[in-house]
């Protein structure tokens, strides 16, 4: 054994020595490279030898080699082989360690293209190797990435790096790439430099312990990372830039998962080199929408890179090695990372990294203002998005950081603003952090005072956000806050005061008196933003009902009054008091005004009514209640606290009145005047008496410049005066009469007039009251006559001003008379001359229609008229007055009609009217007429006039007015027996007005109907309902119509189209009520519907319909389940009237927002049902309602309804009406969005159910729809669902994919098919290619590709049969091309799973291969090329046999094309499969290469395909033929035996090619080929048969030596010649030409003498042609003559050439034919065209070359002399041919040959002197030849001839 080992070792050493020797002998680089390529890999393998000597020898050799290589950088190493060797799992580590050295050395030397080619191998080689070696390989790979070419469409099959199955390698590569991207340019790893030395440059994180000896790495890297990137050969900055660009390109090409590479792009985008940063930025932007920034993997990586390896307290032994510890990245990179963190919710939640990033950005050593700004943005982001649980631990740290920044950093106002804003946001998220820290509030207030203007806004915003945190303060904290707010309310900065107001209004409860006081002071602020906010807060009313408003909502009136009084008295002693003229006020007027209004609100609130300060009229409604409260306060004797008891007044009411008086005296003001009037009027007995001595002051108020002020003052005066009696009263009235008549000042007259009227009125009221209370006639009789006269005088004085030229005084007189008349009979005569009651009535009535009068005058005149019968039970002109009021309607005066309505009501009922009450002390409801009052009720008469005359008037304005009066009567006199007894007539009247075109008329009528219904008893109500329903729904006339001649419904208003107004709204309401089986509900609906703006006015509000509506809403509540669906739809009705009405009802009924969700199913059912209603209006409203319903609510419960909704909307999308179509489109778009959201995988089972429900509908109905918009939306939805649903699509793929494939053709514009049919073949192919390309990039294909990602064996079983069916029977280019594309994708997505189905798919694709459309054919071939990779061998064999059969047997070009395309595709995409079946494929390819190409057809392209297949898969053509010779001969034989002539010819060409390329064929193949070819020759001539002849000639020429041997089954030369010569006798001229040429070639090759037979065929034809060409022209047309000439020419040329070739070396034969042949040639030389001359000369050259007479041993001087003479005579023609140089050239060659031969045979004497002279003369003519070489040659030959003489 030892001996054997020694021997083997010696052999190895000897081998190594020989290699050494060869290396030594290598002189050139090329030689050295060849030796290295051959021997380096095996030499390295010797390192695994067990023999020390061998290993030593190898090392010596390698040392020598290294020296040689290093000095020669161009020498290439066998890197590919070395990489294979390196990957060998059996190789020992010693070998691999050395192998990688040479890989590292050789790889960078390779051309770039080769490096790119080997790049994937480098990656593969890394698997399982030691870390340093992996680093080395990556160092080689990274520079190559820049040069790599990636496919445009990324797919796994086309990807150069197939990384899907190598997750570990991917991770290694990504880590290395990240380090490369982090590496700064020009960085040098200085071993002497320690980390600690550069701590200042590294920021907060470089303080890493225990690494003092390790050099400082670049930011973001560890020492180890830097070292491995630098490697053995550090990159220059330019190379590093290229590497980084290469990495970005690599990521762009999607070679690694997008998720993994996000961080790399972010890092690259921060690069200092523009090219890298721009490329990365662009890529990041393009992927922005695809990246999930909430993915924890991405965010954690970003944090890790940003922060580096932070030393945390870890378990023992878990501390990171110093050289592996990564530093944080540079500020530049941080600036790129943080913006991406800002996109991420996950980043905000990740603790503790989020807070570390914040602190690093704000306070890190290396931070800058940009980073600080971004960090603050991140704080904002955390505050907004971080969930409650996760923000809790962050709060204190964030707050500390922000306060620290605010305190320390003052340079950048913008930054400070952000910091303050962040504090505000933090407070709104975590109020508990701030609640106890009032110092922070103070700090911010102070900052607001002192900071720059641009920062103040942020502080203001922050403080506003912080307010909520302090709303629960109590005790000392609250007091502290009060003081704080109070101190800042007086600061000069407006923002400070504004925020202080915010704090005062929000921090404290609304009944907190000190804060309200502060707000009241703020309400007097000069700046609008401050006082506006304060007023808004103060006037914000408590809840409308007592349930809502608790007693705490406003301060109690007494307490608030005392507080104000205390503050006022205190302020009067300080400089803050306000001086105005001679008056001193405790507050400025604005604040004081707000204070008294607020006190009035507190008073109202304490009195139990809703406080309001908006309208004096509204305030007066509450006077009786306030009066009761004031009486209580006055009688309870409530006193002020002792501290405030300094002004003398102790009762809160008195203090309140004192404050009002003070303000009124100092500044005045209408609201203040009203408040004082109200306070006194409600309790005059106690309070008015105090003002008796202040009548002069009151009079001064009556002289105020403002009319309203004078009116209120006059009222006040009358209240005060009414408390006095006797002479005092008399003198006051006389004084008033006097001032009234004094016309110096209209204002004084106006005030006095009003005061006089009000005073007389109050006097009469008191008189009436005394009479009713005491019934004391005697006392009554005691009334002083002079008082009565005075009252009459006063009344007449007032009356005299009715005709005043001043409207002001006329109105005042009218008002005053009204007041007198309201309270008692007018003290003037009824009739007669002068100022009488009749005159007064007529005067006032005449003013109402007058255009000269103002509206105010008219209003007052109407009111006054209405009051006369109220105060006077015996008023004589009551009916005249009422008739006058009703007849005064002219134009449309709505407001006036409401006033007339009120007046008619009051006048009709007379003394029983509520107008008779004292409005200050009694409400309408509380009033009852005095028992003894005389009844003057004319309601029956009024009702009769309105119903029988005015409501049926032809004038629409009169009808409207009558309706309003009727409504007023019904509302105000609801209990009147006359109204109750005429309910049906009144209803009929209201119904008749419903059809008016005027909206208000309709609304008034509908409100009236509601009131009428409420008034009836049960039986009445039933009758009213049935009548109303019948009238509304049928349009029949009402039975209670008064006048048979008057039409109730004017102008065909009933039954108008829905677009019109008319009754449609009420019909709908009636229909709605009927559907609920509750017809009476129509009245409730009417009350809720059409809430006209009029009802919000003072006049309208008096009817109290808001209350009625609320009650109606409550009564309808039980019907909500039936109502909600209908009402929901009606809100979207196209008819504006119906829509508004129904929306009003909806708003009244549906107060709970969750109601829609509660009744979702019912609403949906109603909408879907009505989508196909026969009324367009209903269809449109259903679509719009559905659009609204679907948005923003969970639809999990109605998934099963979705298909029905889709399908119904699809139908509506094709509606006849455009507005309906648009509504349907809107609904469909919303439905699409909702469905896409519901198909999200996060929805779980609901998502699955949604997809299962939707897909059939979208595929079958949507995509197949004839409506373009429906199809487009369906596809769009499917695409979005596929993106959203992801893996959930898998179960539905078998249905989805085929449907989408079908749609590729269905959805294509049909015009393309038309154009395709009309186009040429070339145009058609180009167009179809473009169509298929468009289909492949369509949304449908995008969806299909999405689905394909998730396919596996579980769904393929169902999908494949459908796919096969579609391939076979699918219609359309797009569908078939798409199917092929899907199959290709399947082969790459799930190759193993596809194997069982590949056979079926192949079978289906075969039908596509024979498709007439070339584009489909190519697509199917392409698919087949991929599919064979996954199929079983048996299937592949069957396919190849099928293709072989098609090619050999089918004559149609389509079959041949499909074979070429398929085989080519298999070769390109599944080369391994082709190699496994090479024996079947390559012979066919060889045969295919030799197809005879038709000019017009695509055979040329097919030949190229076959050629490519052949060349790609054989080791050189010669090697291929040798390898597959048997198969090639078999297939060519089969081709020759084919019935197709074309195939026979193709077989022949292939055979010829075999013979040519092998140079020699050996038995038995030669015999087989020749036999087959000769068999083919037998029989008639056919197109292409020439190829057989050419093949025979070719084979014989190539194998002439083999043919000399006699071999069984191999035809002899004689047999071959016999067969070919036989073909020369065929009639077909073209064929004959080829046959003669081939026969000549064979004769030449075999040197056989068959000249006799050959010349017998050829020479007669030459002679015949000569005769024909010189003969008479035939009658054939020019073209035929031309063709015949060409054929003759071709024949002559061929014949002469053949004669030259067939000229034998046989003395006897030559003797027989030399003379004849020479003569023939000479003749043709003289007579022919230049082409024939050229051919003859060439033939002559061959003739003389083989002429034995020119050889010494066969000399015959005489015969030769004769031949030469003949020749010389004829050749002179050619030599002298001046036109064609080619003829002259060939002629010179012949003479040169002759002279050379004569010289060699020494037979000069045979060239006679005659010949020489002829030749010399002809050669002399060439001396001036244009071509120098001919000139020279001619001169040389001439000289030779001359020398002979």
Curated annotation (Swiss-Prot):
InterPro entries xref list: ARM-like (IPR011989), ARM-type_fold (IPR016024), ARM_ECM29 (IPR055444), Ecm29_N (IPR024372), HEAT_ECM29 (IPR055443)
Coiled coil: none
UniProt crosslink position (Glycyl lysine isopeptide (Lys-Gly) (interchain with G-Cter in SUMO1)): 1039
Endoplasmic reticulum keyword on record: yes
Disordered: region residues: 193-217
Chief subcellular location: endoplasmic reticulum
The entry's keywords: Acetylation, Cytoplasm, Cytoplasmic vesicle, Cytoskeleton, Endoplasmic reticulum, Endosome, Isopeptide bond, Nucleus, Phosphoprotein, Proteasome, Repeat, Ubl conjugation
Family listed: Belongs to the ECM29 family.
Protein's job: Adapter/scaffolding protein that binds to the 26S proteasome, motor proteins and other compartment specific proteins. May couple the proteasome to different compartments including endosome, endoplasmic reticulum and centrosome. May play a role in ERAD and other enhanced proteolysis. Promotes proteasome dissociation under oxidative stress.
Name of the featured protein: Proteasome adapter and scaffold protein ECM29
Gene from which the chain derives: ECPAS
């Amino acid at each position: 054994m030892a001996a054997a080992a020694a021997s083997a070792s010696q052999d190895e050493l000897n081998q190594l020595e020989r290699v050494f020797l060869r290396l030594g002998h290598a002189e050139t680089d090329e030689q050295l490279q060849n030796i290295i390529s051959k021997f380096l890999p095996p030499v390295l393998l010797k390192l695994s030898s067990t023999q020390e000597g061998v290993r030593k020898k190898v090392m010596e050799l390698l040392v020598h080699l290294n020296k040689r290589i290093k000095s020669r950088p161009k020498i290439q190493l066998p890197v590919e082989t070395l990489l294979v060797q390196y990957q060998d799992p059996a190789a020992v580590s010693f070998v691999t360690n050395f192998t990688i050295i040479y890989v590292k050395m050789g790889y960078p030397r390779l051309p770039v293209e080769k490096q790119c080619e080997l790049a994937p191998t480098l990656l593969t080689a890394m698997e399982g190797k030691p870390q340093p070696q992996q680093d080395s390989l990556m160092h080689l790979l990274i520079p190559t990435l820049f040069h790599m070419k990636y496919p445009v469409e990324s797919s796994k099959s086309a990807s150069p790096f197939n990384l899907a199955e190598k997750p570990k390698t991917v991770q290694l590569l990504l880590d290395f790439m990240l380090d490369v991207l982090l590496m700064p340019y020009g960085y040098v790893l200085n071993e002497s430099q320690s980390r600690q030395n550069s701590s200042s440059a590294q920021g907060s994180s470089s303080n890493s312990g225990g690494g003092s000896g390790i050099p400082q790495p670049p930011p973001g890297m560890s020492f180890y990372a830097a070292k491995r990137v630098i490697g053995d050969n550090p990159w220059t900055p330019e190379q590093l830039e290229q590497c980084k660009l290469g990495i970005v390109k690599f990521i762009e090409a999607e070679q690694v998962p997008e998720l993994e590479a996000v961080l790399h792009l972010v890092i690259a985008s921060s690069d200092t080199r523009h090219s890298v940063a721009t490329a990365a930025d662009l890529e990041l932007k393009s992927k922005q929408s695809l990246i999930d920034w909430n993915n924890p993997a991405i965010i954690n990586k970003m944090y890790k890179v940003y922060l580096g390896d932070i030393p945390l307290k870890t378990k023992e032994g878990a501390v990171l090695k110093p050289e592996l510890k990564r530093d944080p990245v540079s500020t530049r990179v941080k600036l790129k990372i943080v913006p991406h963190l800002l996109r991420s919710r996950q980043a905000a939640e990740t603790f503790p990294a989020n807070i570390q990033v914040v602190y690093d950005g704000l306070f890190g050593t290396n931070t800058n203002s940009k980073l600080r700004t971004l960090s603050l943005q991140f704080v904002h982001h955390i505050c907004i998005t971080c969930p409650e649980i996760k923000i809790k631990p962050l709060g204190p740290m964030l707050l500390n950081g922000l306060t620290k920044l605010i305190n320390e950093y003052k340079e950048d106002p913008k930054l400070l603003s952000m910091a303050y804003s962040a504090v505000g946001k933090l407070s709104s998220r975590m109020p508990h952090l701030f609640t106890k820290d009032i110092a922070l509030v103070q700090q911010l207030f102070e900052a607001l005072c002192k900071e720059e203007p641009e920062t103040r806004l942020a502080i203001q915003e922050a403080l506003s956000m912080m307010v909520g945190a302090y709303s629960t303060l109590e005790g000392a904290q609250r007091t502290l806050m009060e003081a704080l707010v109070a101190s800042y309310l007086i600061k000069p900065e407006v923002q400070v005061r504004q925020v202080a107001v915010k704090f005062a209004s929000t921090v404290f409860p609304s009944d907190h008196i000190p804060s309200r006081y502060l707000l009241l002071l703020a309400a007097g602020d000069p700046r609008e933003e401050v006082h506006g906010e304060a007023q808004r807060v103060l006037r914000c009313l408590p809840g409308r009902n007592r349930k809502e408003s608790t007693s705490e909502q406003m301060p109690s009136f007494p307490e608030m009054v005392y507080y104000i009084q205390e503050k006022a008295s205190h302020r009067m002693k300080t400089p803050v008091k306000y001086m105005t003229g001679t008056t001193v006020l405790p507050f400025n007027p604005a604040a004081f005004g707000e204070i008294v209004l607020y006190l009035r609100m507190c008073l109202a609130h304490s009195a139990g009514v809703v406080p309001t300060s908006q309208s004096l009229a509204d305030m007066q409604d509450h006077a009786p209640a306030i009066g009761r409260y004031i009486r209580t306060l006055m009688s309870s004797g409530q006193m002020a606290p002792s501290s405030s008891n300094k002004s003398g007044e102790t009762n809160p009411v008195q203090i309140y009145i004192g404050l009002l008086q003070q303000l009124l005296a100092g500044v005045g003001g209408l609201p203040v005047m009203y408040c004082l009037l109200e306070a006194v009027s409600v309790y005059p007995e106690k309070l008015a008496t105090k003002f008796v001595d202040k009548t002069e002051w009151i009079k001064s108020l009556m002289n105020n410049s403002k009319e309203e002020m004078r009116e209120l003052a006059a009222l006040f005066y009358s209240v005060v005066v009414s408390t006095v009696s006797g002479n005092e009263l008399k003198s006051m009235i006389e004084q008033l009469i006097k001032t009234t008549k004094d016309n110096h000042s209209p204002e004084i007259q106006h005030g006095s007039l009003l005061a006089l009227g009000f005073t007389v009125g109050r006097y009469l009221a008191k008189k009436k009251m005394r009479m009713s209370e005491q019934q004391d006639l005697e006392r009554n009789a005691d009334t002083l006559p002079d008082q009565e006269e005075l009252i009459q005088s006063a009344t007449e004085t007032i009356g005299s001003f009715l005709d005043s030229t001043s409207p002001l005084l006329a109105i005042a007189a009218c008002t005053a008379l009204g007041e007198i008349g309201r309270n008692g009979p007018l003290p003037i005569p009824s009739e007669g001359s002068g100022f009488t009651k009749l005159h007064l009535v007529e005067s006032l009535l005449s003013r109402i229609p007058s255009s000269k009068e103002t509206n105010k005058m008219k209003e007052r005149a109407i009111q006054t008229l209405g009051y006369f019968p109220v105060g006077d039970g015996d008023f004589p002109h009551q009916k005249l007055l009422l008739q006058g009021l009703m007849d005064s309607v002219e134009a449309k005066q709505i407001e006036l009609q409401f006033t007339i309505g009120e007046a008619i009501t009051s006048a009709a009922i007379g003394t029983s009217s509520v107008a008779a009450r004292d409005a200050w002390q009694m409400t309408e409801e509380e009033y009852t007429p005095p028992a003894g009052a005389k009844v003057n009720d004319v309601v029956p008469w009024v009702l009769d006039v309105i119903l029988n005359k005015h409501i049926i008037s032809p004038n629409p304005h009169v009808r409207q007015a009558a309706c309003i009066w009727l409504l007023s009567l019904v509302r105000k006199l609801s209990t009147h027996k006359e109204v109750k007894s005429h309910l049906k007539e009144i209803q009929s009247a209201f119904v008749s007005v419903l059809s008016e075109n005027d909206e208000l008329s309709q609304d008034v009528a509908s409100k009236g109907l509601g009131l009428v219904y409420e008034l009836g008893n049960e039986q009445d109500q039933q009758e009213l309902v049935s009548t109303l329903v019948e009238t509304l729904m049928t349009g029949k006339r009402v039975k209670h119509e008064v006048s048979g001649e008057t039409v109730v419904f004017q102008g065909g208003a009933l039954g108008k189209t829905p677009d019109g107004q008319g009754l449609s709204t009420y019909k709908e309401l009636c229909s709605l009520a009927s559907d609920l089986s509750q017809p009476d509900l129509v009245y409730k609906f009417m009350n809720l519907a059409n809430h006209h703006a009029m009802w919000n006015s003072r006049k309208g509000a008096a009817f109290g319909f808001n209350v009625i509506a609320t009650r109606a809403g409550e009564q309808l509540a039980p019907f909500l389940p039936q109502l909600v669906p209908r009402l929901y739809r009606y809100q979207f009705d196209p008819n504006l009237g119906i829509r508004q009405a129904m929306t009003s009802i909806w708003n009244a009924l549906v107060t709970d927002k969750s109601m829609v969700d509660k009744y979702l199913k019912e609403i949906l059912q109603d909408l879907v049902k009505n989508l196909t209603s026969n009324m367009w209006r209903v269809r449109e409203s259903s679509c719009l309602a559905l659009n609204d319903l679907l948005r923003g609510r969970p639809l999990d419960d109605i998934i099963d309804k979705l298909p029905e909704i889709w399908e119904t909307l699809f139908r509506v999308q094709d509606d006849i009406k455009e507005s309906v179509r648009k509504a349907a489109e809107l609904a469909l778009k919303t439905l699409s969005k909702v469905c896409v959201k519901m198909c999200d995988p996060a929805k779980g089972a609901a998502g699955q159910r949604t997809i299962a429900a939707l897909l059939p509908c979208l595929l079958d109905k949507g995509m197949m729809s004839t409506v373009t918009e429906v199809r487009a939306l369906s596809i769009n939805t499917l695409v979005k669902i596929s993106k959203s649903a992801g893996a959930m699509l898998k179960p539905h793929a078998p249905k989805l994919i085929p449907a989408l494939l079908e749609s590729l053709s269905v959805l294509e514009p049909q015009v393309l098919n038309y154009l395709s049919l009309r186009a040429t073949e070339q145009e058609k192919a180009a167009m179809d290619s473009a169509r298929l390309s468009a289909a492949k990039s369509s949304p449908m294909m995008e969806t299909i590709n999405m689905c394909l990602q998730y396919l596996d064996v579980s769904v393929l079983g169902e999908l494949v049969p459908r796919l096969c069916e579609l391939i076979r029977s699918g219609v359309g280019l797009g569908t078939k091309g798409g199917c092929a594309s899907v199959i290709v994708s399947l082969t790459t997505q799930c190759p193993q799973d596809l194997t069982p189905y590949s056979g079926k798919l192949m079978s289906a694709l075969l039908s596509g291969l024979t498709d007439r459309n070339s584009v489909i054919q190519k697509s199917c071939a392409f698919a087949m090329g991929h599919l064979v990779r996954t199929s079983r061998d048996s299937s592949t064999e069957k396919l190849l046999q099928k293709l072989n059969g098609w090619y050999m047997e089918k004559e149609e070009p389509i079959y041949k094309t499909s074979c070429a395309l398929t085989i080519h595709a298999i070769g390109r995409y599944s080369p391994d499969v082709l190699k496994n079946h090479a024996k079947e494929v390559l012979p066919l390819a060889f045969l295919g290469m030799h197809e005879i190409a038709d000019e017009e057809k695509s055979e040329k392209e097919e030949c190229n395909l076959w050629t490519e297949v052949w060349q790609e898969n054989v080791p050189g053509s010669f090697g291929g033929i040798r390898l597959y010779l048997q198969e090639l001969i078999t297939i060519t034989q089969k081709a020759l035996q084919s019935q197709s002539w074309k195939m026979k010819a193709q077989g022949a060409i292939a055979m010829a090619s075999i013979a040519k390329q092998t140079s020699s064929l050996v038995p038995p193949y030669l015999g087989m080929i020749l036999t087959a070819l000769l068999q083919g020759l037998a029989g008639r001539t056919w197109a292409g048969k020439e190829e057989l002849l050419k093949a025979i000639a070719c084979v014989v020429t190539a194998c002439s030596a083999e043919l000399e041997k006699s071999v069984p089954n191999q035809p002899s030369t004689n047999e071959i010649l016999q067969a070919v010569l036989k073909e020369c006798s065929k009639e077909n001229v073209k064929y004959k030409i080829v046959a003669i040429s081939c026969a000549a070639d064979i004769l030449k090759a075999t040197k056989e003498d068959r000249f006799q037979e050959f010349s017998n065929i050829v020479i007669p034809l030459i002679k015949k042609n000569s005769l024909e060409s010189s003969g008479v022209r035939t009658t054939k047309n020019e073209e035929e003559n031309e063709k015949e000439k060409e054929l003759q020419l071709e024949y002559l040329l061929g014949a002469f050439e053949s004669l030259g070739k067939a000229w034998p070396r046989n003395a006897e034969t030559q003797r027989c034919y030399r003379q004849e042949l020479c003569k023939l040639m000479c003749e043709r030389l003289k007579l022919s065209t230049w082409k024939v001359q050229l051919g003859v000369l060439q033939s002559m050259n061959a003739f003389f070359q083989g002429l034995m007479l020119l050889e010494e041993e066969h000399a015959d001087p005489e015969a030769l002399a004769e031949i030469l003479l003949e020749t010389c005579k004829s050749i002179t023609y050619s030599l002298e041919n001046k036109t064609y140089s080619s003829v002259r050239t060939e002629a010179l060659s012949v003479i040169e040959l002759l002279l050379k031969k004569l010289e060699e045979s020494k037979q000069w004497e045979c060239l006679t002197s005659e010949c020489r002279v002829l030749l010399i003369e002809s050669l002399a003519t060439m001396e001036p030849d244009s071509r120098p070489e001919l000139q020279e040659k001619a001169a040389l030959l001439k000289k030779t001839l001359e020398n002979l003489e």
